[in-house]
Amino acid sequence: MTSMTLDPPLTNPLPPGSELVAGVDTHKNTHHVAILDLVGRPVADREFRADGRGYAQIVAFLHAHGDVVRIGVEGTGSYGAGLARALTTAGLTVIEVARQDRQARRRRGKSDPLDAHQAAVAVLAGTA
């Protein structure tokens, strides 16, 4: 009988120059940001307030983790509009990500970290 080993979670900093993508699940009062490497492995995630100070913290958070080349943002026409402007002003590339079907979200459960992760995956997959 063979046993399967799982890779440990990513705990070491990425090498300098590593490219990353991010996804943001937007809401009226908070935004949840997930950063992935180009293979889709989680690098970091965190929740921020949805205001000017929070936007600045998001930009700093993204820059602190490396070269974030694309950011998938849900709701750039509504709750994500201010954030999309702040990210674009900071020189970051923003891609509109469609919110997932409500019925599908209910089946798997609502999770801001998971929704942010899925937004980043959509950017990686080119489906955003």
Regions found by a protein language model. Give the residues of each.
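Phosphate- and other anionic-substrate recognition elements at nucleic-acid/protein interfaces
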Residues: 1-128
